[in-house]
């Protein structure tokens, strides 16, 4: 039996609300990351001041803290990128295995509210390949070392977001017959992909 649920962002108002939520989550993630980075920087400073060069255990702690600090800095940079432009695309589909409708927003960097609530998926996620590689209708995507999933792709949407504002969005099934708009979107798609790479 097919389970249906209300998918997010069907109307412009709903899309604007989802963007506002996504920006809020991205800002919270960035603030949390900055606080963690500052604490690690303070810890590094304290370790360097407190222990001598001959203290092997302290040197090991210093080394481990330095590695965690560098990773935290990389995470901050990812959070900053996510905050500037949270997502550029979206896919809606019916998952044949789960027997339910799904919607995923796709961005340069994944954004999560918590461990299970993905607000935006990373463009490199296996399911995101559907956005680039498939037309609407029945298709598949594969997860390495796992399996191939069958889906029915209902919507592929492209977003234009600038200065925290949703400028516009386009569904691929709506614009397929409009030659000028298709050319415009193709140009913007190259720009989006260029930004990603």
Feature locations, PLM:
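Extended, charged low-complexity regulatory segments
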Residues: 1-196
């Amino acid at each position: 039996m097919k389970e249906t649920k209300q998918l997010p962002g069907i109307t412009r108002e709903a899309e604007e609300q989802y963007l506002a939520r996504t920006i809020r989550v991205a800002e919270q993630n960035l603030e949390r990351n900055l606080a963690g980075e500052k604490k690690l920087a303070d810890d590094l400073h304290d370790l360097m001041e407190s222990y001598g060069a001959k203290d092997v255990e302290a040197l090991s702690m210093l080394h481990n803290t330095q590695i965690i600090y560098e990773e935290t800095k990389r995470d901050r940079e990812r959070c900053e990128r996510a905050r500037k432009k949270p997502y550029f695309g979206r896919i809606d589909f019916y998952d044949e295995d789960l027997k339910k409708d799904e919607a995923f927003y796709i961005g340069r960097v994944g954004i999560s509210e918590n461990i299970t609530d993905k607000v935006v998926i990373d463009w490199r996620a296996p399911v995101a390949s559907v956005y680039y590689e498939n037309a609407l209708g029945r298709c598949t995507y594969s997860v390495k070392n796992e399996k191939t999933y069958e889906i029915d792709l209902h919507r592929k949407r492209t977003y234009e977001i600038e200065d925290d504002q949703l400028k516009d969005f386009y569904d691929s099934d709506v614009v397929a017959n409009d030659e000028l708009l298709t050319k415009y979107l193709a140009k913007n798609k190259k720009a989006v992909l260029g930004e990603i790479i």
